[in-house]
């Protein structure tokens, strides 16, 4: 079970998240939506302990961390002077993973990352991330920068992975979430509201309602 409780998260005395509770007990794909600046990325970082906040986040009895939870930032940090193969080994060593021999995306092994396009860099990071099977994945705008074929490959991979893992996807591509997620969390006014797949019509009304 994944449980995130954020009593308060502030930046320079501005409240970003407050009295937020998120609890997921079953594997599946879950969406996270919200307007720009609502705190979607901050939520992920708080849960992982990458940002200071008042609250707690647990996966079962363990604290959520980068050791037991996978995280793909919207703009992954890569080392341009490494090849993809070198980066995969570096990532595996950093997070105590077994280097993989099979990868989701085919990429040149001997090219430096600095020679890659934005989409190829995203593929490089995802390949490194998926070297291990995690129980929880936080994916922040994972489809951004990828071409149609890569998005198709990634989505099908995540759908299969979601049979045994909790996968939370932050995305502005709402149709992908509607068509594939078990439920969607709407982040608005510092808090989250959950909508299951039978309530997605209500989600749109709530999202565009200017009242709290």
Question: Where do the language-model regions lie?
Answer:
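Conserved H-loop
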Residues: 173-179
């Amino acid at each position: 079970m994944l449980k995130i409780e954020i009593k308060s998260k502030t930046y320079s005395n501005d409240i970003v998240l407050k009295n937020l509770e998120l609890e997921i007990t079953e594997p599946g794909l879950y969406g996270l939506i919200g307007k720009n600046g609502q705190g979607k990325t901050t939520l992920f970082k708080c849960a992982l302990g990458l940002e200071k906040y008042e609250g707690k986040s647990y996966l079962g009895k363990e604290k959520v961390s980068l050791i037991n939870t996978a995280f793909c930032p919207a703009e992954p940090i890569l080392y341009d002077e490494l090849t993809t193969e070198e980066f995969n080994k570096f990532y595996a060593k950093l997070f105590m993973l077994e280097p993989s021999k099979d990868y989701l995306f085919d990429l040149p092994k001997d090219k430096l990352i600095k020679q890659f396009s934005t989409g190829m860099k995203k593929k490089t990071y995802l390949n490194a991330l998926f070297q291990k099977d995690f129980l929880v994945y936080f994916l922040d705008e994972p489809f951004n920068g990828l071409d149609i074929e890569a998005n198709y490959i990634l989505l099908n991979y995540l759908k299969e992975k979601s049979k045994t893992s909790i996968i939370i996807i932050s995305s502005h591509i709402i149709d992908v979430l509607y068509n594939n997620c078990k439920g969607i969390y709407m982040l608005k006014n510092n808090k989250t509201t959950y909508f299951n797949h039978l309530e997605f019509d209500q989600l749109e009304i709530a999202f565009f309602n200017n009242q709290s």
